[in-house]
Amino acid sequence: MKVRHIMVENVVTAKEDNTIKNAIEMLYKKHIGSIIITDDEGKCKGIFTERDAIRVVAQKVALDEPLRKVMTKNVITIQEDATFEEARRRIISHGIRHLPVVNQKGKMVGLLAIRDFLDELFGIKFLKPD
């Protein structure tokens, strides 16, 4: 099975000049675990996750600061034509929970999260809260 068959395509993205506050609000309101930071060409520049949000609040970083100051850079990605097994190995070896999926030109086309793997492996469906 290829990554493109199990990835989520409607990924929430933001620009690196968005504020931290705006990103945290998006995580909360959309019930998501990560936001992919993209450039004007749709290429992945970084990622901001729930764990990043907790770190930012704990370190008392000003919430009006831009995401570029706190996002994780040098993001691990995977090609959409990669296999499920390749994606699984990448997630495990890098200890990550969110894996942006890119096309051959490096443009972000989807996202694989640990929840997608659990669903694929064990048929576990995660329901969004009301």
Regions found by a protein language model. Name each.
Residues 1-11, 65-75:
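Bateman (tandem CBS) regulatory domains
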Residues 4, 12, 21, 54-55, ...:
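Nucleotide phosphate-binding site architecture
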Residues 13-31, 38, 78-95, 102, ...:
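The conserved cystathionine-beta-synthase
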Residues 27, 35-51, 91, 99-115:
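A glycine-centered beta-loop-beta connector
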Residues 83, 104-130:
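Cytosolic regulatory modules rich in charged/polar residues
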